[in-house]
């Protein structure tokens, strides 16, 4: 195990007293995994989390006098933000599939790219969630599922309006309803057929909304953050 290797590397011993596990030990372990073992920060955090569980048990059994993790904060893993470029988004919009279900999934994904809605929010949209303001702009008014906070999104782009019109039917729901698992599976097929190597998910669609759609149209970052339902701009 990594912890045994580290102890031998640092102390040239197979074991050490638990009371030697202080804050510096954790920091050194983190550095060792990064530099000597070339681990990613995600992997490092998992290994440190396992050590934390051992310390928790040791504390309960009074085998250690203090908690070395008291001041420790896991380091943030750098994640690559994935979103579609304008060219990729245009390619997706222009593509017509022979399969009706693929066209439906494509349309729902594009709708998300132009509204920033999550999966459950999008597929639970009802006609009653749409309201027009004094200027005639159509808005979505709904509660965000994760936080149960009300949110509103103006439909300022033609794409979501065209999609709503396309699927206007007797149903109370705005869009075709597709299970999450099936939706994601068909998104893979769509990406493959277009030669897009990025993973298409609702998360990718929200990032596309924030970057390609909003920021590239010179919409202020504060507005982008608000439309995505973030309490902080950095989220």
Regions found by a protein language model. Name each.
Residues 56-66, 112-135, 222:
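Short, charged phosphate-coordinating catalytic segments
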Residues 37, 104, 115, 198, ...:
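Flexible coil/turn residues that form the inter-helical turn or adjacent wing/linker of helix-turn-helix
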Residues 83, 144-148, 180, 228-235:
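Catalytic-site neighborhood detector that most strongly recognizes the C-terminal catalytic loop/helix
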Residues 60, 110, 114, 120-121, ...:
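C-terminal catalytic core of tyrosine-transesterase DNA break-rejoin enzymes
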Residues 1-37:
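Basic/aromatic-enriched alpha-helical hairpins
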Residues 41, 45, 64-119:
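Basic, Lys/Arg- and aromatic-enriched nucleic-acid-binding interface segment
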């Amino acid at each position: 195990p990594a912890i045994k290797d580290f102890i031998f590397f640092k102390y040239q011993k197979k074991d050490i007293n638990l009371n030697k596990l202080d804050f510096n030990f954790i920091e050194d372990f983190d550095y060792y995994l990064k530099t000597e073992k070339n681990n990613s920060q995600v992997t490092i955090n998992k290994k440190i989390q396992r050590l934390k569980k051992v310390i928790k048990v040791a504390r309960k059994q009074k085998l250690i006098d203090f908690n070395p993790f008291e001041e420790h904060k896991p380091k943030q893993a750098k994640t690559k933000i994935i979103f579609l470029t304008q060219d990729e988004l245009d390619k997706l919009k222009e593509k017509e599939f022979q399969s009706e279900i693929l066209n439906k999934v494509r349309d729902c994904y594009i709708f998300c790219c132009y509204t920033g809605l999550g999966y459950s929010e999008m597929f639970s949209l009802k006609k009653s969630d749409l309201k027009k303001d004094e200027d005639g702009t159509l808005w979505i008014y709904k509660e965000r599922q994760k936080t149960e906070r009300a949110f509103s999104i103006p439909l300022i782009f033609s794409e979501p309006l065209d999609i709503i019109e396309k699927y206007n039917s007797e149903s109370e729901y705005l869009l075709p309803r597709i299970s999450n698992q099936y939706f994601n599976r068909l998104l893979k097929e769509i990406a493959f057929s277009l030669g897009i190597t990025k993973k298409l998910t609702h998360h990718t669609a929200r990032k596309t909304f924030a970057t390609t759609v909003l920021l590239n149209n010179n919409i202020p970052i504060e507005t982008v953050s608000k439309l995505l339902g973030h309490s902080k701009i950095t989220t």
